[in-house]
Amino acid sequence: MRSIREARRAILLGALSVAMTGCATVKPAERPRRMTVRTTAYTGGEPGGNFSATGTRLRFGGAVNSAAADWSWMPVGTRFRILSNSREYVVEDFGSALVGRETIDLFFPTFAAMHEWGTRNVEIEIVEWGSYPVSKMLLDRRLDVSYVRRMAEGVNLKLALHCQ
């Protein structure tokens, strides 16, 4: 089991390095560093289980927690901090209800914690923006799913606008 995860991680890291040598993503100066966003909550008991769209185990309670978003708005790998509680998150998942919405879905380990969070508008600070090329690479493997196609179209548009 561990060797399969290690192989997935090696493939992802290799693909990431290839993708990073491609065109630049949206220029950092054009992206906000602080914003107020709508957040919702999800847990591993929902469809998809305890693994993210990147293949990593969903995380909570450590240095960095897992989050999901529409990758055409907030690309995979984006790290942010919720200012009210100082928790840091990384976008490594997506969900059908997030496509076309500027909402972040935060991972919680239990249904009780998920319901306690509910829906909140919070101020976040972007620690590091993620990668549209890596988002594209990961989404392109799942284009048979309609909401993934919609997200991929948005990612492709971002890439087309910012690549020469």
What are these regions (language model features)?
Residues R8-L12:
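N-terminal export leaders
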Residues A15-A24:
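Hydrophobic h-region of N-terminal signal peptides that target proteins for export
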Residues C23-Q164:
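Solvent-exposed, well-ordered loop and adjacent helix/strand elements within mature globular domains
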Residues M1-R5:
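N-terminal secretory signal peptides that target proteins for export/translocation
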